[in-house]
Curated annotation (Swiss-Prot):
PANTHER family: TRNA (CYTIDINE(34)-2'-O)-METHYLTRANSFERASE. This is tRNA (cytidine(34)-2'-O)-methyltransferase. Keywords: Cytoplasm, Methyltransferase, S-adenosyl-L-methionine, Transferase, tRNA processing. InterPro entries: Alpha/beta_knot_MTases, SpoU_MeTrfase, TrmL, tRNA_m1G_MTases_N. Gene3D superfamilies: 3.40.1280.10. Coiled coil: none annotated. It comes from Aeromonas hydrophila subsp. hydrophila (strain ATCC 7966 / DSM 30187 / BCRC 13018 / CCUG 14551 / JCM 1027 / KCTC 2358 / NCIMB 9240 / NCTC 8049).
Length: 156
């Protein structure tokens, strides 16, 4: 499976929804601190319902600690600043999908540290700025999982 990495997420219900998404797909969730909310915020739990126990969630003090411990094969910056469509890449087990905080996106230093082909975006109309974080994560997760044949799902 792949790893979902939320860099300094700010909105508890988004993180809760992503926890539920990970529980349903088997993807692992990594949260890069500082979080913009308390981990025990009831809005995180409410959005994730009773799926928290079925999701693998880890917190990291910084992005470097995540990279060192997990050592993903490739890291993809999922950003409005990307040039490659999310569906134009062949994902593989061991990849990590990195998303920035809701209000400001990923730091430019992180984006620029990755090769151009690993800076991905979801196609949108020109007048649109961005998508909701939980929705964007779901788009990436289901595209990558589709490419992997929905490994581990009930459809197998």
């Amino acid at each position: 499976m792949l790893d979902i990495v939320l860099y300094q997420p700010e909105i508890p219900p988004n993180t809760g929804n992503i926890i539920r998404l990970c529980a349903n797909t088997g993807y692992r969730l990594h949260l890069i601190e500082p979080l913009g909310f308390e981990w025990d915020d009831k809005r995180v739990k409410r959005a994730g319902l009773d799926y928290h126990e079925f999701a693998e969630v880890k917190r990291w003090p910084n992005f470097e600690a995540f990279l060192e411990a997990v050592a993903p094969t490739r890291v993809f910056a999922c950003t409005t600043k990307g040039r490659t469509a999310h569906s134009a890449v062949q994902f593989a087990a061991g990849d990590a999908l990195l998303f920035g905080p809701e209000s400001r996106g990923l730091p430019i230093e992180i984006i620029e540290s990755l090769p151009f082909e690993q800076r991905l975006r979801i196609p949108m109309l020109p007048q649109s700025r961005s998508m909701n974080l939980a929705n964007a994560v779901a788009v990436f997760v289901y595209e990558s999982w589709r490419q992997l044949g929905y490994a581990g799902s009930l459809q197998e």
